[in-house]
Amino acid sequence: MATEPNEINLRMTQTRMKQIEDTTFKIRRKHDDMYTYLINDIEATEMYPDTETPFRMKSSLNNTYIQVKCQIPKLIMQPPLYNNDMYPLNHNSTNFLEDRPFNYLCNFDWFEFLSRSKDELGMHYNMIRDLISMSSQTRYSNIWSNISGIIMYLRQYKRGFALRSILIRLLTYWNNFPFFDTWDGFKDVLPKTSTAWPLLFYAFMSVAFDYICENISEGDAIVCFQNHLENAQISYQDTKLEKKNGYTLWLKYECHNLRVALTPRYDYTGTVYGNFLKDTTEYIITDEFEENEIKMKNILNPSFYKILQQLRREIKTVEDIIRLLTICYSARDDRTYYGTLMELAISKAIKPQVAGSIVPKPIPTSWLQKDPKIVLSAKYPSTSFLSQMQEFYRRYYPALQREIDVHALSASFINFLSTASAGVGIELPEEIINMVKDKRLLYLLKKGSGKRVLQEALLVERYNDLDPIINDFVRLIKIVVRKQIERRQRGIAGIPNNVLKINQVTYEANKPFSKIARAPSHGKQSGNASDIHDLLFYTTQEDVSHIEVNGKRQMRGIVISSADVKGMDTHIQINAAMNQHLGAIEILDGIQYDVGPFRQTRAVIQDIQGNVYERNLNGGQQAIAFGLANFSQTTGINSKYFGQIPNQEGTFPSGLITTSNHHTQMLTLLIETAATTFTNEFGKSIAIAHLMILGDDVSLMLHGNDKDVNFFMKYLVEKFSQLGLILERDESRNFGVFLQQHVINGRFNGFSNRIAIFTSEDYKTRKSVQESCTEYNALIDDVIFRTYNVRKLLQFQRIHQFVVLSKYIFRVQNYKYEKLKAKLATRLNVFEYDLKPHNDSRENVQNQNMLRFIGIQIPYTYFQCSGGGEIPPESFQRKDGSFTYEYSIYSPKGKWLRKFLYDISCTIDEPKFRIDDEIMRMYNLDICDFLIQYNMLNIQEEIRATIIDRELISKLAMNLESLENSNARMISRRASESLRIMGIKLPANGVYGYQINERLVKVLQNIQQSDYEVKMVGDALFTAIMEKFDSHKVRMEKGDRLHNFTLDFSDKSDRLVINKKMIALHNISISKNMAPYSDAWMLYTCLNHTYNASSELSTALAHSQGHFKSFQYDRDMFAESVKIASKHGIGSLPMELFFEASNIRDSAQLKWIEAIKYYIQFKDYLYPYSINPRRLFFIPEQVSSVSSLLNQDNIPADANKKALMFRRAYAYVLSHPFRISGAKAIFVDDRIS
């Protein structure tokens, strides 16, 4: 078979851009044209005319040749007919039968099913239609646009001929697209179409994406897609879940089989400083390897298993292991979300699972004399393990009490009222209905009344009533569906606000636990490699040794346990969960804390010895005790098919505020207590080198010989069982997993298949173009260090994002349509739509005012503009024929990308720093600037803002404010109003008194509405287009002058010093994208991780980004404060009012004043841009790290000048790492590269 040509790196010219835009416009305009585009691919069919007959291609693992084919199984091409026995009902038709063949969508003839009548199918008629709709998951546009974006990229870069040929064969089977996915679900299904095809087309996109990024080869991609096809023959998602664990059972053996591996050494900062040959001999549980081999052979499809075994024989290094794992991940899952009817998922999602022991109920030791159900203290039976855990928990009480912020408690409930669902719907109060005149606003309020913050504002008068709380405690809790990638669908309890109010008290008491305990991990807070520092460190320990124990040779050293706590929410028994609430009652003793109807009181208490006495109880303690008395809450679902389906009592409601905190605390106490009792019972200690816990994720680093570690882990499993939990063991000396982050012998093995570019959990959520671009960039940020070839990833993003997001549809009154179309068509491709008039006369006034669809194609370059899509720009041709430098995937965002406008404008013949109007027009950059300046792609938000009644919002905000024991918001509003009278208007979201208002506005802004009610071109925008669209020019902005610089690497006399990182990583990749001499490798090894900046320089560096030291402030509000201080003086009345409006007091105010003074003095040394820690990950984020790349004679002595130079040079190096050579760079002002 033919092979692909060598890699090509196309540069952007006006001609090529026009060709991409016109092709995209054509295929996005008509489905027929898109279908024709996809199947008319002569290059692909000529190179691979037959992909069904086995042929040889290279694998990504050491270029090993493998036999591949793509044969669509007969059951997919000729699917069975649907019958109701596929989803049988129980005997009284109140739910699905417990013992049924499928929980997810199975394979059957889709077209034939849709032809069946409701009379024939009965209840299944609607249920199965809804089940099929779960397969519609497209994140942007539709399936076919996404596939077109993939194919357009592959054609542009002359790649993927075999995959393209396979797609042609799939699509020509129907002679058209087999179905269409829209906002309203699937339509136009063709005969002989299996219900598996939507997910299989996502699978095709998934393997194609992995191939594009070189995570796998094209041959691997075909193998993986064939595996997906075979899995889909009966029930695709059920089968994937069954086989999921089989794909990586070989990992531990292959690590062991290496015997030795070149391994990086990390210092205390997490930086590589050397390497060594590590003994990879594994910690082995009896017969573990043999059992895993048998499981793999039985679980995996024979065709995939055969190739897996072939590739395993090629493994020689840790990098090879990670390569093969990546292939297995691509074959295992397809980046789709596991979605089904909640009625089919309930048994796995929320139904209580009985495992191990029944946890004993705590014995009350004190209670209210008048109501013994209100228990104030209790102890677990002394023989139970929970009794020992409870005593261990008590050791934390004093520290927890010290950390509680008593002054913040009154406002804490309001802060928890998010814009998420409140779990229960309400009727709008009559008073509110009477206040609303606009039907559109009434619609928004009705939709938004189910959101926490708005619902509480509407029902605030009932805040102090006990009856609503009692009602909500006995109410059947609504289940909110959560779909996940690679994990079965979950059910989150939609907790009502009143239950949240009670539960929040326990949370406040225990919130500091994560701060004061050793084990709780704060997870992915930084987003960079510091999150996996512990795994990097403990998988690279050298202290493994062989010892003799009773004549047997054993290993001693670090063992990493990545044990899985199975279904923690469904396994936690009520009696076990009560421990935290009982502790909270004691922790909160002695403070002033009122909660709703529960107020400070003097209560008569009776204890277990029969003593009766009086005691002060605060509202928080009473609220918890009330909650405990009603803790046996039933979780269930309100089924649209079966009515109310109650769940058995005992499930831990995963929607509680305390859920993550409770699980973290419970597991920490369990393991710490077990380590203590282990020593007491057996007279030997187990060395826990490190322990990380967050929610139900546990990573345990143990030190000892194999026998002792195994003995302790068996003991730990038993202790988990005594609490009704199942701990599935997974120990290794070579690898560990925590929070889905996997490290193997010091290498980060990121799970690329967990990042979904093409699918979304909720495909119906509509976002603006700007929001979609931000989301797409965030997805790319997540996948960079999980991907082998990030240059190809970036090339793909530029084309794919343009194809799926460039079609923008809005509405305009009919009488404006022709004028607007004519004006826009002078520079843009315009999508035209016919008008469907009310009557025959198109001149009728009613028809003239009708809203009519019109669309534009957003220019290709918009997606690479600052303020637009902000994809790092590619290499563009200038007027003189030269090309700009391409910006790398690590490039900063924000104002930094405006440098590209000057890069493309300045030439050797015309080096003057300027924006060239001609080149702006040539690449439509002036149009992009117009779209951004006039917010033309965010029409919905502006129209929604005109609907929302601010007076009503203020009333609702005041309702919530009445719950606080403070007048700070009122003082803030008065100060803001005084400033307004003086002509100073502060941003509403920065004024403390209006922050509740802004949260309520956000609820209404985010409610989904139909296109018929939003996205209409208003008069102001219409006028702007008609008057300024043609003549708009890109203007130079304040601060742009600082873009006039370059780095000159031509002085070969000033050489870069070869450092320890370069030597250590000469043959090692610590992540997939960090192969030696790759962009990430160059940045990691050449930037200085340990630059020691002085205090003065640190302050200057923070200022250059717009910060002051480590002080955090709202940037918009700070800008306003600088204006006020500059005009009126720092000690002026307006400044006092500003601080009152912002609720900035005491030490924070002093810091703010200090920041203002510094800013005013050094305002010319600002160069802000944004970098995302996830995008850089291993790469140093410290701007000063660039110092090692700069000619030292060129660096100024002044701290602010030095900081500004470092900041500019750092952005340049991140954007153009390929320019780094053996020489240090000279910083050159007043010259564009």
Swiss-Prot record:
The EC number(s) this enzyme carries: 2.7.7.48
Keyword Transmembrane helix found: no
Catalytic activity: RNA(n) + a ribonucleoside 5'-triphosphate = RNA(n+1) + diphosphate
InterPro entries named in the record: RdRP_C (IPR054002), RdRP_N (IPR054006)
Superkingdom of origin organism: Viruses
Annotated Pfam families: CPV_RdRP_C (PF22213), CPV_RdRP_N (PF22209), CPV_RdRP_pol_dom (PF22212)
Domain annotation RdRp catalytic: ranges: 1-775
An annotated Gene Ontology molecular function: nucleotide binding
Family: Belongs to the reoviridae RNA-directed RNA polymerase family.
The protein's role, per its UniProt record: RNA-directed RNA polymerase that is involved in transcription and genome replication. Following infection, it catalyzes the synthesis of fully conservative plus strands. After core assembly, which consists in recruitment of one capped plus-strand for each genomic segments and polymerase complexes, the polymerase switches mode and catalyzes the synthesis of complementary minus-strands.
Assembly with partners or alone: Interacts with VP6.
Name of the protein: RNA-directed RNA polymerase VP2
Taxonomic source organism: Aedes pseudoscutellaris reovirus (isolate France)
